[in-house]
């Protein structure tokens, strides 16, 4: 959700479900109990049940019967399991030749009972021994499996066991610290409702949309399914009435997301995966900008967001172009970045729209870019991130290539300045007022920087628990004042952190395929759209009756942390193997091209330089494929 409070033209009214029964506000508050009737009446006004024409949600709105169907299906499956077990028992008796119905003679009854008791005791003892042995074997196997991937002292005996125990204890302590009790919410439901009734809360809805109570009640409302491949991008128009999506099928779909139907479906004109498609602001939804893996930047001309005219290429990168950055109020200008390290500014009013702003370099070496964002408070400034650890801020008015490669200032976590393994930044985004800058690092955490701090300043906050490894994963602020941080994860979950406390307050299963890449908040409503490896767009709204329980959170973040640590340990060996292969290949090529007449074993200087530059490019490409493969 951006900071803008756009027009509500064409949008449905909000009304019917309760959104404010958070456990934090129910902590023994007697006053809240006495005023429960008032709260029920007020909260009914603040629900987020969205329908196309104000009708019942069952007539094309949000589905509300899923939980009942799930419960009934679970009961049916449970009854089927019970019947299956009874049939198996019956077959067991038939195969063993025993009789289900045995009637002893009168004189034999007591004797048989004693014999049966003895047999049962013997069989019971044997079964208990067998079960104990099986349990011990299973425990030993589990311990072996857990110990195998761990890196540590390889000695036998107590040293290895002590190391494993210390490692497990440290991991448990880390998980506990990340899932500790949440602080008291700043926005109080009872107080806010009371002030609203008195007329002293004119921005009630605006403030409520940034409240923790809404975020903790998010649940999946429906899926928008019309793509035949991964969906890489979703974007709301300025008024929030339309949603654009695109992906691997090269199609762009414009949705009426409230009525759950596409209003426009057209070919993008790209030849490879579309990475981003965005409506330009203040143009009546008539212009859509796109970029893709083929390096092209294209613009589609729409008429009232319901009729497609054509697309044209306005810029060409020499590598994949992952992100666009819009100027908040301009219907003509935007920025693009690509893996060729180039930043273009596009002005649709010019005959030649694209002009090169800067080529990102570090120590005279190009740095491929994955992300770009414009400062909403100062549109001359923009930030980029890519194939190294630095977030760079530029000012278009004073880019001097001779001074610090034109960089105004750059940030990175201090522990990553001289790290032993390559680090990538997959997404950078400014807060609603441009004072903060959020950066998501590949195989690391999410860091918050103060954009007004001096060059090289340390991060101010750090958000942990998710995993960012396999794709170019996005991150975003959520809330009218950027109160929350939201990100997808390789584990298929969506994580919400409260920015002030850096703690996880919401944890949602967002993908069947395992990765969520793009998260787009609505401009002013408490609605979130997301996409990833699944072939659909998911719409989330805060319509759950109670706050979502963070069931399984500790297990998931523990697994994410363990997998990340394992990858960091193995990365060095993989890189060394690649370098060994490259050196052997280089030596072989030199042997083949030796001058047999003179016996010289050295290349000319020009060929050596060219080979060196080629090796740098190859090394970068391999590292990119290993660490940060775009979807």
Swiss-Prot record:
For this protein, the record's PROSITE patterns field holds: WD_REPEATS_2, WD_REPEATS_REGION
Q: Does the record's keyword annotation contain Cell inner membrane?
A: no
Family, per entry: Belongs to the WD repeat DCAF8 family.
Look up and give the organism this protein is from.
Homo sapiens (Human)
Classification via Gene3D superfamilies: YVTN repeat-like/Quinoprotein amine dehydrogenase (2.130.10.10)
- Where do the WD repeats lie? 226-265, 269-310, 316-356, 364-404, 420-459, 467-507, 511-550
Extent of Acidic residues compositional bias: 77-88, 108-147
- Cellular component per GO? Cul4-RING E3 ubiquitin ligase complex; cytoplasm
- What is the designated name of this protein? DDB1- and CUL4-associated factor 8-like protein 2
Q: Annotated region Disordered: where? A: 1-91, 108-163, 594-631
Organismal lineage: Eukaryota, Metazoa, Chordata, Craniata, Vertebrata
Keywords noted in UniProt: Repeat, WD repeat
SUPFAM superfamilies, sorted:
WD40 repeat-like
Bias (Polar residues): 44-54
């Amino acid at each position: 959700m951006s900071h803008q409070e756009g027009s509500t033209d064409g949008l449905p009214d909000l009304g019917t479900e309760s959104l404010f029964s958070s456990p934090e506000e129910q902590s023994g508050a007697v006053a809240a109990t006495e005023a429960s009737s008032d709260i029920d009446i007020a909260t009914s006004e603040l629900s987020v049940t969205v329908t196309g024409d104000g009708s019942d949600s069952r007539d094309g709105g949000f589905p509300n019967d899923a939980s009942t169907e799930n419960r009934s299906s679970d009961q049916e499956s449970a009854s089927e399991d019970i019947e299956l077990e009874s049939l198996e028992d019956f077959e067991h008796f038939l195969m063993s030749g025993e009789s289900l119905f045995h009637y002893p003679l009168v004189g034999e009854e007591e004797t048989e009972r004693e014999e049966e008791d003895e047999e049962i005791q013997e069989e019971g003892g044997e079964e208990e021994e067998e079960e104990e042995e099986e349990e011990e074997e299973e425990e030993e196997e589990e311990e072996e499996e857990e110990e195998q991937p761990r890196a540590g002292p390889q000695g036998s005996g107590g040293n290895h066991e002590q190391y494993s125990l210390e490692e497990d204890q440290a991991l448990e302590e880390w998980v506990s610290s990340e899932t500790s009790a949440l602080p008291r919410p700043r926005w109080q439901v009872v107080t806010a409702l009371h002030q609203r009734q008195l007329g002293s809360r004119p921005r009630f809805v605006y403030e409520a949309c940034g409240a923790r109570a809404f975020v903790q009640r998010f649940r999946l409302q429906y899926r928008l399914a019309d793509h035949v491949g991964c969906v890489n991008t979703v974007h709301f128009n300025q008024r929030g009435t339309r949603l654009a999506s695109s992906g691997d099928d090269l199609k762009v779909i414009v949705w009426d997301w409230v009525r759950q139907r596409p209003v426009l479906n057209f070919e993008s004109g790209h030849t490879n995966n579309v990475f981003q498609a965005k409506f330009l602001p203040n143009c009546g939804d008539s212009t859509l900008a796109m970029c893709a893996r083929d390096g092209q930047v294209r613009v589609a001309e729409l008429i009232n967001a319901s009729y497609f005219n054509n697309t044209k290429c306005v810029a060409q990168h020499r590598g994949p172009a992952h992100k666009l950055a819009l100027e908040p109020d301009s219907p003509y200008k935007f920025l693009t970045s690509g893996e060729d390290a180039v930043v273009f500014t596009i002005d649709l009013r010019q005959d030649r729209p694209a002009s090169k702003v800067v080529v990102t370099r570090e120590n005279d070496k190009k740095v491929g870019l994955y992300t770009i964002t414009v400062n909403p408070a100062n549109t001359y400034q923009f930030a980029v991130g890519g194939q190294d650890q630095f977030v760079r801020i530029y000012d278009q008015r004073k880019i001097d290539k001779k001074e610090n490669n034109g960089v105004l200032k750059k940030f990175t976590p201090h522990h990553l300045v001289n790290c032993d393994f390559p680090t990538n930044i997959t997404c950078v985004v400014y807060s609603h007022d441009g004072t903060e800058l959020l950066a998501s690092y590949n195989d690391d955490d999410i860091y918050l920087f103060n954009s007004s701090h001096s060059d090289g300043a340390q991060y101010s906050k750090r958000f942990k628990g998710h995993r960012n490894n396999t794709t170019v994963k996005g991150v975003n602020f959520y809330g009218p004042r950027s109160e929350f941080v939201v990100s997808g994860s390789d584990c298929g979950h969506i994580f919400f952190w409260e920015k002030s406390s850096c703690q996880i307050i919401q944890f949602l299963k967002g993908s069947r395929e395992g990765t969520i890449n793009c998260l787009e908040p609505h401009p002013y409503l408490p609605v979130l759209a997301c996409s990833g490896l699944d072939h659909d767009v998911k719409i989330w709204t805060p319509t759950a009756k109670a706050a979502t329980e963070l069931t399984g959170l500790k297990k998931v973040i523990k697994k994410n942390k363990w997998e990340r640590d394992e990858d960091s340990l193995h990365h060095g060996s993989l890189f060394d193997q690649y370098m060994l292969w490259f050196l052997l290949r280089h030596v072989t090529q030199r042997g083949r091209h030796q001058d047999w007449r003179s016996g010289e074993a050295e290349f000319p200087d020009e060929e050596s330089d060219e080979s060196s530059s080629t090796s740098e490019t190859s090394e970068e490409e391999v590292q990119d494929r290993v660490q940060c493969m775009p979807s």
